[in-house]
Amino acid sequence: PLADVNKIVEKNIKKNKVKEDKLIIVDFYTDWCGWCKRLDNETYKNAEVAALMNTYFYPVKFDAESRDSLNFAGVPYKFKPSGSRGTNEFALTMASRPGGRIGYPTITIISPMGEKIVVEAGYKNADKMKLFLLYYGEGHYKTKDYITFEKEYNQKQLTD
């Protein structure tokens, strides 16, 4: 079956009445990944994390080993078999770090035009995820590096 990610995004935009200029945040996971399950069961269940995700992003969960073909930003992606498993080309393209390696979970933030903004591999607890979501969701990544943002954010928390 063909899954058209663009149509899913458009449908969700209409359904949730969200802005079309929102960033897309994709959680690349696999069924066998323990840290992916922990991210689902702990981090994503945090009310503040959920609110930030829905405020600033169009959230998508994507099984990196999905055998379904899909289209995104006009580009077709298919399943690429490898041994007894394989990886979807969408994950290979959007979740790969330099050198072509993918770790799970991986969170990728994509512009509304389909351009990768950041690829972040590994588990994040709720506090780290909130900071990550604020940094990208509020556009701080355009004007300062993450370490500077984190220091400023932590200082502000101490004075509030």
Residue map of PLM features:
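Non-globular targeting/processing and membrane-anchoring segments
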Residues: 1-3, 111, 116-160
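A short beta-strand-turn-helix
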Residues: 1-23
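N-terminal post-signal-peptidase region of extra-cytosolic proteins
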Residues: 8-12, 44-45, 90-92
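Short active-site neighborhood of thiol/selenol oxidoreductases, capturing the structured segment around
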Residues: 19-34, 59
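Surface-exposed patches in mature extracellular/periplasmic domains of secreted proteins
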Residues: 23-25, 102-106, 141-146
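Detector for the c-type heme attachment site
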Residues: 37-41
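Short, conserved loop/turn and helix-capping segments at secondary-structure boundaries
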Residues: 43, 47, 123-126
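Thioredoxin-like thiol-disulfide oxidoreductase module
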Residues: 47-49, 54-118, 131-139
